[in-house]
Design a protein with these regions (language model features):
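N-terminal, polar/charged subdomain of small-to-medium soluble alpha/beta proteins
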Residues: 2, 7-97, 113-140
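A charged helix-plus-loop insertion that forms the helical arch/lid used to bind
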Residues: 96-110
Length: 140
């Protein structure tokens, strides 16, 4: 959590990938081809509106190269897919001491509900495929 941020809100870390997959107990639980690996952190004050705004922003984000090599295309433009993985450590507060606290993270039941809601929203916005990790699992 960056110091000085006034309000905590749903966060996503995006990694452009040519292919990604996540496994639980040696079995693949989700995968995607060219597109994004999305690590999603859900905070206590988050709601469906936050998930809607973030999903729409990600779907329209122009970070893929066009024919001239300029980052000018969205995941929709390149026919990409996404893999969404819950990542509560994005909600960590590192400001005091050397041990992070997670007091701002949403309770597991709420976080799981919003993670599923966000994933479903991405399925609507990104028709070429959305894979998922398993909420709360030790993912590999």
């Amino acid at each position: 959590m960056p110091a000085g941020r006034a309000e905590k809100e749903m966060q996503a870390v995006l990694q452009r990938v040519s292919r990604a997959e996540v496994s639980v107990n040696g079995r693949v639980s989700g995968s995607c081809n060219r597109g994004f690996l999305i690590l999603l952190g859900v905070f206590e004050g988050d709601g469906e509106e936050d998930a809607d705004l973030l999903a729409e922003k990600i779907a329209k984000l122009r970070v893929f190269a066009d024919e001239q090599g300029k980052m000018n295309k969205s995941i929709l433009d390149v026919g990409g897919s996404v893999l969404v993985v819950s990542q509560f450590t994005l909600c960590a507060n590192y400001v005091h001491g050397n041990r992070p606290d997670f007091f701002s993270a949403a309770e597991p039941e709420k976080a799981n509900r919003l993670y599923e809601y966000f994933s479903e929203r991405m399925r609507i916005l990104v028709p070429n495929g959305v894979g998922n990790g398993v909420f709360g699992a030790d993912l590999q």
